[in-house]
């Protein structure tokens, strides 16, 4: 199975269409930030889901209300709720939306307690791929200026859920690492400027390549 993963388009979906044309993936995963209201519309999503099954979380630059309305060709919603999963073929994909904050002043804020609660739900579901917009602290969380941009709550969620693959975004800087236990953590980078990743899933394991369109 071939999976393409994108993140942080911020209203520019041209790279996504180029990626789909070049890679012809079975599944498209997105770690959020498609674009806000006024940047992206129903027809923009329709043009993508007509080509490929899509699964996404939302970030801090998304039209969340619109994302909830978008459906794949088979009628399934593209957006994963916090602590929920979606199945594709023999993969279980779990999601936690938004970015960390101490409050709910914005619709895309998520607190430590909510991240922990979502992770606890996912623990019961034997998740293969975990997707968040925010990043785990100290793991694939380098910013473009070389500082760390992750949050501890996502690190704890990663440890609890224990997926084979963890995909995140938000920082606009691609990075990756593999833990000593073999789990792969990938920050997709900045798809608006061409970053993306390709995963081949075979024999219960992922092969990974970071690319630029």
Language model feature labels by segment:
Residues 11, 55, 62-149:
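Conserved catalytic scaffold of divalent metal-dependent phosphoesterases
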Residues 6, 11-88, 160:
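Core catalytic region of metal-dependent phosphoesterases/phosphodiesterases
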Residues 15, 85-89, 156-160, 173-213:
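Binuclear metal-dependent phosphoesterase catalytic core
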Residues 8, 28, 33, 59, ...:
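Divalent metal-coordination and catalytic microenvironments
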Residues 7, 58, 83, 97, ...:
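Residues at the C-termini of beta-strands that transition into short coil/loop
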Residues 1-4:
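Extreme N-terminal starter segment of soluble prokaryotic enzymes
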Residues 25, 127, 151-171:
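Proline-aspartate-enriched helix->loop->beta-strand connector
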Residues 10-16, 35-40, 60-68, 86, ...:
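Active-site environment of divalent metal-dependent phosphoester hydrolases
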């Amino acid at each position: 199975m071939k999976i393409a993963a994108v993140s942080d388009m911020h209203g520019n979906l041209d790279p996504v269409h180029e990626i789909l044309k070049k890679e012809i993936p079975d599944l498209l995963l997105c770690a959020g930030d498609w674009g806000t209201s006024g940047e992206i519309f129903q027809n923009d999503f329709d043009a993508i889901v007509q080509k490929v099954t899509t699964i996404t979380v939302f970030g801090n630059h998304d039209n969340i209300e619109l994302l909830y309305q978008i459906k794949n060709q088979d009628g399934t919603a593209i957006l994963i709720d916090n602590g929920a999963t979606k199945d594709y073929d023999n993969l279980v994909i779990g999601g936690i939306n938004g970015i960390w904050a101490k409050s709910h002043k914005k619709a895309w804020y998520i607190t430590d307690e909510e991240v922990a609660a979502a992770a606890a739900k996912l623990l019961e579901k034997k998740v293969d791929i975990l997707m968040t917009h925010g990043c785990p602290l100290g793991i694939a969380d380098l910013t473009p200026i070389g500082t760390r941009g992750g949050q501890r709550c996502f690190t704890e969620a990663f440890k609890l859920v224990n997926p084979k693959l963890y995909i995140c975004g938000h920082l606009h800087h691609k990075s990756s690492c593999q833990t000593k236990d073999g789990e792969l953590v990938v920050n997709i980078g900045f798809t608006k400027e061409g970053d993306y990743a390709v995963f081949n899933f075979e024999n219960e394991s992922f092969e990974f390549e970071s690319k630029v369109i």
